[in-house]
Amino acid sequence: MTIPKDNTQLENARRLRREMTPHERKLWYLFLHKYPVKIYKQRIIGRFIVDFYCASARLVIELDGSQHYTEQGKCYDKERTAMIEAYGVQVLRFSNWEVDSNLAGVCQTIAQTIHARLTSMPPAQE
């Protein structure tokens, strides 16, 4: 299944790539950018911009700050996750606190999930 992309979000995605949050930068530079499977920053999936996307594993990695824990944020994230998962993409969510306090555990979960998805599914088309 080809994943649609809302091209009106291109400029916003480019800006977000340049202006990563401290937690996104930490995960990117200490782990994701050198991971042996290509992972993209601030990728457009449907009408959403996700923090990180591994196309070959069809995996989204999201880092959640405090706004995600309000009732409105929880509802939005639930809708967003359901729409992304409808494309056959799994969504992993980590809090900023987890990135700060347990980066090794976050990285291990990401690596295990990518490995499991790559060994259990046919190659994805981007």
Tell me what each language-model feature is:
Residues 1-126:
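Nucleic-acid endo/exonuclease domains
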